[in-house]
Design a protein with these regions (language model features):
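Long, low-complexity, charged/polar intrinsically disordered accessory regions
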Residues: 72-124, 128-289
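C-terminal accessory regions
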Residues: 1-76, 82, 119-120, 126-129, ...
Length: 290
């Protein structure tokens, strides 16, 4: 692992789901109350649905519920990681705790063994000169998990919803699991709806996706990649005629944009260049911590 003890403030900015004092039940109740609409297929798969059915909203709800659902698990991991009690307490009350747990979820979605990896990151170097241990751990974790786990030849796809959002796994209450699964389903449905509507309406940005292949298997791959681009546009409310719109505004969007760029590159790859395109995508992923 590459270990550097420089906390990156850009990666620890406040997140909508960062509220370490909220109970799981109150968080779930708050999300449902703020959803503004019943989570039904009828209301969420139409192209004209309002803000409450967008991926921007559904992803924010998913991440808020995920943070509450996994809070106890990550707290136990931190307390058993080799930190002393005072250090562990400081991590749990840090403003960077939410960003750290989001990074843990992302790393697990990339198939890293968090229970083994995290204690090794704690033991890599002390924290005597650290102003915020949570920020330092966030930085170490992001550096150590910059690529999906596995060898270059046997690397498996990360567990992402609509190609963008890290899936929350592990033990949690049935109520939390149901809330996450429901939003997972709605996000995937919304991505399909956005793509289908754009194709039907012949939106200018869809021209950059290239034609749908005739062969069934190739057509499925094409649609899978095109849905990532559609999901990215919906999550960040992009109306530009180019597929990915203007430059990303923050680190979270940069990561999502890199994933969408990789998907777009697969759609537009020329025959005979798969290895070159794959190398570009992997290099870009390393730079952004994908």
């Amino acid at each position: 692992y590459v270990i550097l003890d420089r906390a990156d403030d850009d990666h620890t900015e406040p997140h909508p789901s960062d509220n370490p004092d909220a109970s799981s039940r109150s968080v779930l109740y708050g999300v449902v109350q703020h959803s503004g609409a019943e989570l039904s297929a009828h209301e969420t798969i139409t192209a004209e649905q309002d803000h409450w059915g967008s991926i921007a909203q559904l992803a924010a709800e998913y991440e808020t519920v995920a943070a509450a659902a996994q809070k106890d698990r990550w707290a136990a991991l931190i307390r058993d990681s080799g930190l002393d009690d005072e250090q562990a307490d400081s991590v749990l009350v840090s403003d960077a705790f939410g960003a750290l747990t989001a990074e843990l979820r992302r790393a697990e979605a990339n198939h890293h063994d968090i229970d083994r990896l995290f204690p090794r990151l704690v033991a890599a170097r002390g924290f005597d000169d650290a102003e915020d241990i949570a920020k330092v751990l966030h930085y170490r974790l992001a550096r150590a998990t910059a690529q999906t786990a596995g060898s270059a030849r046997a690397r498996v796809a990360p567990r992402l919803i609509a190609g963008l959002i890290a899936r929350a796994d592990g033990p949690m209450t049935d109520q939390m699991r149901q809330a996450l699964d429901e939003r997972h389903r709605l996000i995937e449905q919304r991505a399909s709806a956005v793509l289908d509507t754009a194709l039907t309406d012949k939106k200018p940005w869809t021209r950059k996706l290239g034609p749908t292949p005739d062969e069934e298997k190739a057509a499925r791959r094409w649609r899978s990649s095109a849905r990532v681009v559609a999901a990215y546009r919906d999550r960040y409310q992009i109306t530009d005629t180019s597929p990915l719109g203007p430059p990303a505004q923050n680190d979270a969007q940069k990561v999502d944009r890199a994933r969408a760029e990789t998907a777009l590159r697969r759609l537009t790859a020329k025959p005979g260049r798969p290895e070159q395109d794959r190398a570009v995508a992997q290099r870009q992923g390393r730079d952004l911590g994908l």
